[in-house]
Amino acid sequence: MKNIDPEILGLLMVKYGEDEQTRQAMGECGEFIAAAQNYYRAKKYGHRTETVKDLIEEAVDVYFMMLQVRYIDQDMFDEIAEIKYKKIERKALAK
């Protein structure tokens, strides 16, 4: 996967502003939810090819937007991400 240059994220924040990028992130999350619903519906009825692509495309959009949300306060984001990671690590390793 291509790493996103932090400078590009900064340019986007300057160009569009924190509020607009946050609203865009909300929209992308909504599109991901819709794609996930369509994926499960198609999975049930056996027509998955296009819905898998749609699901992944929306997941990538959300991923890029979350990188921009991280740009708002990188230290706080990373601190919380570390706590969340430890939580899922415990769940994964629990017997």
Feature-to-residue mapping (PLM):
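Flexible "arm" and connector segments at domain edges
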Residues: 1-95
